[in-house]
Amino acid sequence: SYDGGGDDGWFMGYKMDKVSPKDKQMKTILYSLLDVGNPYMYLGYFIHDINYVLDYGEACLVYAGKLMGLAGYGKVRDEWVEPLTDYYHKWNREGYNPVENNAPGYMEELGKKIGLSFVYCWDDMSEFYEHAHPEHRLKGDDAADLIATSQKVFEDLVFNEIKPFIDEYKTNVCLTGGCALNILLNSKIRKYVKKKYNKEVYVAPNSSDCGLATGLILDYVRPSTPPDLTYAGEDVIDKDMFFSYCDMKNQKYYNDPTELKTVADNLRSSKIYGLVQGTSEHGPRALGNRSLIG
């Protein structure tokens, strides 16, 4: 389990044994000070092609997925691997030590090592004071290559941390926590586990706080069969306002199935739709009852 932080740490490993008595089924085998989520997402502040998000808490939820996508457009620069590895290790922490307060220093040092400028706003009258300057962000190959190299460092750090335990226990693997939503890393781990030990890798999809609550309940109830929580989220909270929204925005409401052809034609014309139906997903999803299609 590795993510942006929890009550018991940032990077934890457990050995599960459901045959043992309940109080002995879970054994802690890894307690690491390694924090890979925050240094990974923090680089998003400096990438021009990613919409700027000022709030740190919101940025933690927004930047990571977009950075993973951007990594595919860049190339790993071998000479940047060591400086970025050093940058990641500066975020190592114990408990809630707010190392992110030192991020400007981390970025300045990284910039000197790799020859890039990470510009901050030091105007104390600006809302961006002490944050990345929104008008001076990285573009082009420098931006894409930085994120591609960061993705490699991220993968190497996590894989090297958990590989000894995979090799020792030779069993199925469960990945959880926000960082476990990085499908590039998940694929690397799954390929290794499957090829070397012919075991399976399960990635918990509900890595947000809803998963924590569910885990506590399931640990207490111990259901005999796995519950289907795919769409166990909230209903559309403002669905009663739909017609009012249409009137406010002067939008047309389609209620005849034959008019869906209009939607199809618009999609073929590269227009984008937001799809909202039923209850929401239990945890973050790229597609489902809350989707952007185009």
Predicted regions and their residues:
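Flexible beta->alpha loop and helix N-cap segments adjacent to enzyme active/binding sites
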Residues: 1-91, 96, 181-182, 186-294
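Phosphate-binding glycine-rich loops and adjacent basic patches that engage nucleotide phosphates
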Residues: 2-5, 116-126, 176-179
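Hydrophobic alpha-helical scaffolding
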Residues: 29-33, 136, 140, 144, ...
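A contiguous, well-structured pocket-lining segment that forms one wall/lid of small-molecule binding clefts
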Residues: 58-171, 184-192, 196, 225
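Short glycine-rich phosphate-binding loop at a beta-alpha junction
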Residues: 169-178, 274
